[in-house]
């Protein structure tokens, strides 16, 4: 859990640098990313990343950012040390300085999207020394995970470690968000798996509920099968081709935000009519995913963020009613009880440890 976070600045595209373009075959990508223009892939989802192995003493990333709200930051890991870069230039190509004065030799850098839909960006490439070289990465892990979730799965406010078991700090502007340390992405690293993290803060199952994309709220029923999932993108909302990625394990962690009904009384999962409606919509998503992933293991869950236990009971009912041995309901030791604010780093790692153990206990048979 120990991290080395260092903010860096930005500069215009530098001279006397070698640009490793985004379509270089030695770069490795992970996440639900738009490759319709391979020279400028677009990153929408929290945790999506690109990795490069290179020689030289410096590295920068060239991007074009599209901001919607919050302070804009990207994360990186270079030679095992994590950092972040903060910037405020949008709608033009900029170069983000990641590292300089590295020792001569071989280095590895991963650039990742820390935040969810506060922005998206086009990745143009990495800049390295003029005499530097890009080297082939090791292959991606064979194991594959996909997570559908909300702000907890996206790592929202997880770095506000002075607020453990407390409400979120006011007006934090996204600076504590870090998808790299969401329980889902930690679990994937623990298990040596790839992950596509389809997580968005505030999202509920239904459209017009929850907190995401006010005042025209968008739910997971309209997001789970999308590439760009918000209409403000340059291409608008775009479909995802499920042939591009087939997970061995699907985590489905939606339900935390579902009581919210803006301008009206909250939805009550104890109400029989609403419970049936909500469960049917939840099942519809799972069954559609099951049709696309016939061999996957599905784990239905809610997180340690405080919520009423009736929501956990409803998820348990769904798992039982689907009557599929490879669809299970998992509860953390402190599901719904740990914190009134977003889980911080200790709680994210607590969840990851328990989920890692749960999946490990299923044995190698769950992996393709």
Regions found by a protein language model. Name each.
Residues 251-260, 282-317:
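Active-site segments of SGNH/GDSL-like serine hydrolases
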Residues 46-47, 169-271, 305-309, 346:
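Conserved SGNH/GDSL esterase-like catalytic core that processes O-acyl groups on lipids
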Residues 185, 189, 276, 280-287, ...:
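Solvent-exposed, polar/charged alpha-helical surfaces in well-ordered, non-transmembrane soluble domains
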Residues 144-148, 153, 195-199, 248-253, ...:
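Structural recognition of the beta-strand scaffold that forms the well-ordered cores
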Residues 297-368:
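Extracellular serine-dependent O-acyl
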Residues 135-138, 236-246, 287-292, 364-367:
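Surface-exposed acidic, glycine-flexible loop patches that form ligand/cofactor-binding
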Residues 183-194, 285-297, 319-324:
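A structural motif corresponding to the C-terminal end of an alpha-helix
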Residues 1-179, 363-368:
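N-terminal secretory targeting modules
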